[in-house]
Amino acid sequence: MDARSIAATAANKGFLTAATDVDVNFSKPKYFFDKNIYANRVFDSKGVADPSVEIQFGPNIKDWPAMSALPENMVLKVVSEIHDPVTTTDELIPSGETSSFRSNPLGLAEFALSRKDPEYVGRAKEIQKAQKAIESGECAGKAVPEVAEIMGVVKKKFPEASHENMGFGSTIFAVKPGDGSAREQAASCQKVLGGWANIANEYATKRYRSNLINWGMLPF
């Protein structure tokens, strides 16, 4: 279909129409290239940078939250179990309606496992309170009461463990997670919610396992 037939079809409200069926005298006007049409639509900042101007971010563009390094000792709580044969990255973090949150890490994380385990986010945030308490110099047991009971058992078996070399986080179990697209948000969303590991029988793809490692999570 040539350009004239496309124009004829558009003029005929979308009905396929050949250019020869339109009662019009076609002409061939001489074309003159006007670079201003393109120059006016493209921002070229080369050589005109102004450090004094503050970059204005939209309301849905957020910085990444602070993330702690992996501690020497960890207490992990399994906050979601998925026993399907395979868990896809689209189930770990859905696409579609979440696309507008790609520049908002915490906002995007609210959708993590929403189609598979809607309670996951709340449970992950609850144990994350213990880690945040440690980072702010407070008692993890006061922030999350069940941690106080766990610490009693931990200190009996591991006397060297203390709040100085210990961290608290969440993990999920899945039979075979990570099938599907290579979206790293499947791992990063768990990380910003306090996730420090995945437990699996096997991993569906090397790239998902690599994404976990790249985001400071242990692929057990």
Predicted feature residues:
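Fe-S-dependent hydro-lyases/dehydratases of central metabolism
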Residues: 1-220
